[in-house]
Every structure is written in C-alpha cells, then in structure tokens.
Amino acid sequence: MAGTHADVRRIIPEGLSIGVDEMRAIVQIASRRPSTGRWQIVLIEDADRLTEGAANALLKVVEEPPTRTVFLLCAPSVDPEDIAITLRSRCRHVALVTPPPEAIAQVLIDNDSLSAETASWAAAVSGGHVGRARRLATDPDARDRRLQALGLARDAATRSKAYAAGEALVAAAEAEATVLTAGRAEAETEELRTALGAGGTGKGTAGALRGSTGAIKDLERRQKSRQTRASRDALDRALIDLATYFRDALLVSAGAGGVRLNHPDMAEQIAAMAAHAPPDRLLRCIEAVLGCREALAINVKPKFAVDAMVATIGQALRD
C-alpha cells in the first residue's frame, strides 16, 4: 500500500469524480501483463465517484478481465447510489466491518507511539476510521474543527449566532482545503510552465507559451476540482460529526443506555440536549444534516446547503 509495488495500481480520485478518460487510461494499463509477480492488482478507491461513462468503460474490462488482473473496487455499500448495478452484479462482494475503538487505539499506540489515553480518546470519537483517529490525536487543528462542528448544534438554536456559525463552518472547510492543496498546485503550475519554456530566452520561447494555453487551463481545471473535492470532504466530515452528535442525543433521549456514544467526551452536553429536545425534534435535526449532505452531493453551493440545514435545526431546537 506504499505505492511502490510494480504490479499494484492504486487509483485514488483527487477530483469530484472519476471521469471516462481517466478510467480508459486505467483500463489500458490494466491490460498489460504483470511485471514481477503472477498477478496484477488494480485498486480503485471511492468507486462511488465513478461517472456513468467511467463505469461503462470499466464494465467492459470487468466482464472480460485481462489474464491475471484483479480489480478491487472500494465503495461505501452495494446500494445503487454507491455503485452501478451493472458493476455490482459482476463483482464478488466482500463486506468489511468497522473496527472497534479498542482495535483502533491499539493501532495508534503501536504505530504512532501515542499514549494510551490519547489513543483511546481519538479512537472513541473517530467513528471507526483509523485515519480520522490518527488525525484527531496528532493535529490540534483537526480537534478544533471537530469542536466547531459540534458547537453548531448549540449555536443553531440562537438566532443571533446560527447563520454566522454555519458560515464559519463552510469557511473552515475551505481553509482546510486550501492548506492541503495550495502548495501542490503551486508546484505543479511552476513545473508545467518550466517544461513549456517559461523563463527561457531565445527564439520561439514566447510563442511556445502562447501555444500552451490549453495545457495550463487543463491543469487549472484539475486543480480546481481537487480543491473543491478537498473542501467538500472537509465539510462532510464536520457534518458527520454533527449528525452523530444528534444521534447520541436521540439515543439518550430514548433511553438506549447500552449503546456506545459516538462522542463520549461530550456526554454532559449531549444529556442536556436530550433533556431539552424530544426524540422527534432530534430526528428532524439528523434529517436536516443528512439533507445537507445530499444537497452537497448534487453540487448545491455549500453556503446555501448549510444555511438551509441551520434554519431547520434552529427551528427544531427552538420549537
């Protein structure tokens, strides 16, 4: 998984989707024979991001795969919204269970040399995601963003704070995306311009740059898609935290004491919310967050989607 094995192709989409041109290139690579071993593995992460055209291009090679090539498609579920029915029907399904917090904590202790206390806390609030647990345990900014997301449950009930809190949530996601992508984008642009002759002298250099406008625009398009993806992912993590916070309050309100909370470190605040809001209102809050995620998935502007969510949550908590 380090990306160094010659016969393992790991496809990680950086943009909002996996397009047909990218998939055709992958299929072409997969048609080659293994170079060092007996088998070649093509691992496609986030297969739910395949466009219809990309899914059709992949379907052809999945139906008649090259000799000794195995395709692994990773998707949240086998629901038609996550993976095309035609692809699903031609694949063997392997369900992966969510690891328990204890197992995640042990991974952090063994691999990251974290204290047992820090590892246990991060594992408990990570939602079963090892990478998220590691980020929360080691990155103070990630912990601050989580608290900001959970604070929206409180601020949404106050008219003077509600929309400002929503805008701050969107701004934080965009800022996180900029930090993650800006340095790479700058390096890519500089590398391309250098390859095209920028900074050079002599006959023809200016004309070469003028003729390369299409290549530069294509790079800018891919960079914009990558940053949008990073921003949407950051906002989605915040929304998942918020939804599970309301879920915890719903469990407490319903008296489901034997179920593990997603945010055990916020038990007092969750109990206070459960005492204030009955189950039907908490369910409306959860539906509002899930509705916001669905709106973002169909490219509604984040500000509009979050504002609508905040309005619904605020009304539910104030009624």
Feature annotation, model-predicted:
Residues 68-69, 75-238, 255-319:
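Charged, glycine-rich active-site and insertion segments that engage polyanionic ligands
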Residues 1-53, 79:
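Clamp-loader machinery-focused feature within the broader ASCE/P-loop NTPase space
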Residues 42-45, 58, 69-76:
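Structural recognition of the conserved hydrophobic beta-strand(s) that form the central parallel beta-sheet
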